[in-house]
């Protein structure tokens, strides 16, 4: 099995290109602010005590007409 000179040169060029691309890639990490769970979102980092967490969707029980609830 003989490889042609063209195939060898293409393989060599591909290895060089891949090594350049891999060396210039920088990995991005998740910082600590994204992992803070003890502070509410949208509060200043220096004074989280000044913020009060509001429920996103307060509970409201539903009522169907067959249950004869008030207001229906």
Curated annotation (Swiss-Prot):
Pfam families, alphabetized: RALF
Q: Main localisation, per the record?
A: secreted
Keyword Mitochondrion attached: no
Q: Which UniProt keywords apply?
A: Disulfide bond, Hormone, Secreted, Signal
Q: List the disulfide bonds.
A: 43-51, 63-69
Q: Which GO terms describe its cellular component?
A: apoplast
Q: Which domain of life is it from?
A: Eukaryota
Look up keyword Cytoplasm and say if it applies. Answer: no
| Molecular function terms, GO-annotated | hormone activity
Q: What range does the record give for the signal peptide?
A: 1-27
Q: What role is this protein assigned?
A: Cell signaling peptide that may regulate plant stress, growth, and development. Mediates a rapid alkalinization of extracellular space by mediating a transient increase in the cytoplasmic Ca(2+) concentration leading to a calcium-dependent signaling events through a cell surface receptor and a concomitant activation of some intracellular mitogen-activated protein kinases.
Put simply, this protein is called: Protein RALF-like 20
The gene behind this protein is RALFL20
